[in-house]
Amino acid sequence: MDVKILTLKKWIDESDNVVFFGGAGVSTESGIPDFRSVDGLYNQKYKYPPETILSHTFFTRYPEEYYKFHREKLVVENVKPNAAHLKLAELERQGKLKAVVTQNIDGLHQAAGSKKVLELHGSILRSYCSSCHRPYPADKMNHGEGVPKCICGGVIRPDIVLYEEPLDDRIVNEAIKCISEADVLIIGGTSLNVYPAAGLINYYRGNKLALVNLSSTPYDSEADLVINEKIGKVFSQI
């Protein structure tokens, strides 16, 4: 086993206060495309730039165009948790992992069995009326046709954070609390270029910061351990 992975395993074995902060790279091994890589959503050609489509203004003005993109690109069928999701759920059951803080919207951490999951950007598995806030099952939104409407006449929207929208203060504050109190902070599958989410790791006060990502990140120099490898491969060895 790689000496760096051995070090990470030792940190986890000796701790009962581990927090995991993850991004799109955690789910790519389950077949969900990321956003910013060469093959990611943001580097593909559409009628409008994906960053524009995934904005509050665009959703409000052109909900039909939004939902075409949503159903074609954001909804991925028959995906299952991978080795990273499963190991994190196992570590939580063992009393070692205190929380998963994720930028992902796919619900795979919960599907793997994780209980304490702080979804910074919401979930594609939930939806609600943009007018009266009545909650709705995601099926109508993800698999229907046209623009889904509430019984009040309002447009049903996904429970995700679009561009131009703030993060949920309650979730952010809980994430800050978990990160600031963590003994070991593992950051995985994220380029750490998305703010304000990436800025949350600045609240970590410990000396066991591990970065697991295929490519380099702006925080590599601040980490105590950097592993440039697929996160599923790393977690399958822990």
Sequence positions of predicted segments:
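Conserved catalytic core of sirtuin-type NAD+-dependent deacylases
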Residues: 1-238
